[in-house]
Amino acid sequence: MRDTAFRSIKAKAQAKRRSLWIAAGAVPTAIALTMSLAPMASAQSSNLSSDAVIGSIAQGVTDGLTDYLKPRVEELPAGEVTYPEIAGLPDGVRVISAEWATSKHVILTIQSAAMPERPIKVQLLLPRDWYSSPNREFPEIWALDGLRAIEEQSGWTIETNIEQYYADKNAIVVLPVGGESSFYSDWEGPNNGKNYQWETFLTQELAPILDKGFRSNTDRAITGISMGGTAAVNIATHHPDMFKFVGSFSGYLDTTSAGMPIAISAALADAGGYDANAMWGPVGSERWQENDPKSNVDKLKGKTIYVSSGNGADDFGKEGSVAIGPANAAGVGLEVISRMTSQTFVDRASQAGVEVVASFRPSGVHSWEYWQFEMTQAFPHIANALGMSTEDRGVECAPVGAIADAVADGAMGTCLTNEYDVTGGKAQDFANGRAYWSANTGAFGLVGRINARYSELGGPASWLGYPTSSELKTPDGRGRFVTFEHGSIYWTATTGPWEIPGDMLAAWGTQDYEKGSLGYPTGAAVEYNGGLRQQFEGGYVFRTSNNQSYWVRGEISKKYAEDGIFAQLGFPTGNEKLINGGAFQEFEKGNIYWSASTGAHVILHGDIFDAWGAKGWEQGEYGFPTSDQTAITAGGQTIDFQNGTIRQVNGRIEESR
C-alpha cells in the first residue's frame, strides 16, 4: 500500500546502496518480457540487469499498451469568454481569450511566439481569496501532465480532485493543456506535425502572463507526473531562479543510462508516433545530457526537491490502498522504470550534497489515483518552500447568521473562507459557489455559471447589486436564473449566462420571458447609439436614448439588424403590432412592415409615407411594401408595393399602379 512516510537523503544514507538498479531482481522475467505478472511474484528468481529490464519493458509498451494512461476525452464546460489585454508581454505573445468555466477556473487561450502554429490552452485554478483580496498577489503551483496529454483539458482536472483539493488554498494552480509526448521540452525540430517549444513557452511566455495579468508574486513550485515529472526537474535545473520547489511523481529521472534512451524512444513512438531524435537529437548528444535530471541535480541545491514512486506492486483491494482497480500491466512496468530512475537520481543527489525528500512507496503502479495521493503528500513541502502561512494552506471556517441559514441544505458544499466584507454587505466562499448578504436583500447562495458571471461583473459592486433569490429553474425547464436588485442573470447550456437590466427585463417580460418568441438572451446588453441593445434567440431588446425599453423580434428584427438600417430608422418607439395580414413596428424615423408574402421592408417618414397613408396604408390600394425605400439617382426616393410604386422626385410625389 501507499504509506505517508517521507525519507530525506540524510535519513536513508545507511540504506543508500539498496539501489533499485540492484533491486531490479525484484522484477520478474515475466514482467520484463511480457508485463503480465505482479513484480513481487518471483522476486528471488530474476537476475536481469537494469538495462535489460528497461529495454524489455520498453519493448512491451510499443504496441499501444500505454493507451490506458490517456485521460478521458472531456471538453471543458463552456463559459463566459473575456479578452484580457495584458501589457508588457514578449513580442508575439498575447492572451487571445479567457474562458470562465467557474468563478475560480479560467481557461486561457494563448498566442505563442515560440509555438505560433496553433493557440495553446492553459487552465488556471484561482486562489481561495482571489475575490476577497483583490489587491493581493499569490504564489504559483505548476502541475505538468503525462505522456498521453490531450488537447481538450489537463489530465489533472479530468482524473484527479485537484480543483477541489486546492479550492481552500491560496495559490494559483497552473495546468498547461496538451504536449503529448513532448517532455515539455524545446525540440530540435518539427516532428509528427508539431514543432514543440514547450520550455520556452512555459518559462518565457506563460510566466510573464501570470506575473502581469494574474497577480502572481513569482514564487513558483513546479510538479509533474510521469513524463511531466521528468520535465519538471529538467525545467527547474535549466531555470533554477524561477522555482523554489520541484516535484516528480513517478517521473523518469535518469534519461541517459543504459536502456533509458530506448525506453523513451519506445514511449514516444507508442504515444502518438513521435521520433525521439527530433526531441533531443541523436542519443548521446549534448541535448540528451542537458535533459538528464540526474546529471544536473547539483543545479537544484538549496531548493525543496520531492521525488516519489511506487515499486510496481499491485495493491488493489488491500488495506490503505488508493487504487481504484486492478493494476494495468503496462502500469506495473512503467512504475518499475520510474522507481529505478528515481533512485538513481536520489543517489546522485546524495553524492552532490543535494537533499531530496524521497517518498518511495512499498507498492503502487503508474496510475492517476497514486498521483492524486502524491499531490496531497507533497503539498506541505510545497507550502513550506513557498512560504505560505498556515491560513493560506487551508481554513477553519463556519458559516454564521443569515448566510448559515441560506446554505443549510448543504448544496453549497463546505466553506472555504469565513464571512468577509464586500461592498454594502458580506460574502462567504464555499466549495460550490459563494453566498452573499446585505441588510436589504438577506442572504442567498449562488453556484455554477451564474455565480461565475456575477463574479466577473464585479459581484455586489456591479450594477446588478445583491441577489434577491438563489438559483431558480425556469418554467420551461431549459435554463436557470437568479434575480438581483437591478436585473437578472439567465443561463442555458447553449446560450451561457447573461445579465439583463431591470427595465429591459420588464420589456422582455411582455413577451412572456424565455417562453415567448424572443427566447433566451444570447449576449450582454451593449452600448448602442446612446442606448443599449441586447440580443436574444429570437430578436432584440433595446433601451432607447430616452430610457424607454422595447423589443424587436422575428423578421422585423432581422431587417432592423441589417447594415445601415438603424441610421435610417433610429430606435423603436413601441413594440411590434399585429395587423391584418402581417405586422409592423414604429421607429423614430419610419416603420418596418412585414407580411408572409412580402417579407420585412423599411419605409421612412415623409411625403412618400404620407401619400401611401392617404391610400389606406397596407390595407389600402397599394398593399404592403415589397422593397425598402431607397434613393434614386435623379434625386429623390422610391419604394415598391404589392400593387404599385410611389416615388418622390425633386419634391414631387409620383404614383404608379
From Swiss-Prot:
<dbReference type="Pfam" id="PF00756">
    <property type="entry name" value="Esterase"/>
</dbReference>
<dbReference type="InterPro" id="IPR050583">
    <property type="entry name" value="Mycobacterial_A85_antigen"/>
</dbReference>
<feature type="signal peptide">
    <location>
        <begin position="1"/>
        <end position="43"/>
    </location>
</feature>
<dbReference type="InterPro" id="IPR013207">
    <property type="entry name" value="LGFP"/>
</dbReference>
<dbReference type="GO" id="GO:0005576">
    <property type="term" value="C:extracellular region"/>
</dbReference>
<keyword id="KW-0732">Signal</keyword>
<dbReference type="Pfam" id="PF08310">
    <property type="entry name" value="LGFP"/>
</dbReference>
<protein>
    <recommendedName>
        <fullName>Protein PS1</fullName>
    </recommendedName>
</protein>
<dbReference type="InterPro" id="IPR000801">
    <property type="entry name" value="Esterase-like"/>
</dbReference>
<keyword id="KW-0964">Secreted</keyword>
<dbReference type="GO" id="GO:0016747">
    <property type="term" value="F:acyltransferase activity, transferring groups other than amino-acyl groups"/>
</dbReference>
<dbReference type="InterPro" id="IPR029058">
    <property type="entry name" value="AB_hydrolase_fold"/>
</dbReference>
<comment type="function">
    <text>One of the two major secreted proteins.</text>
</comment>
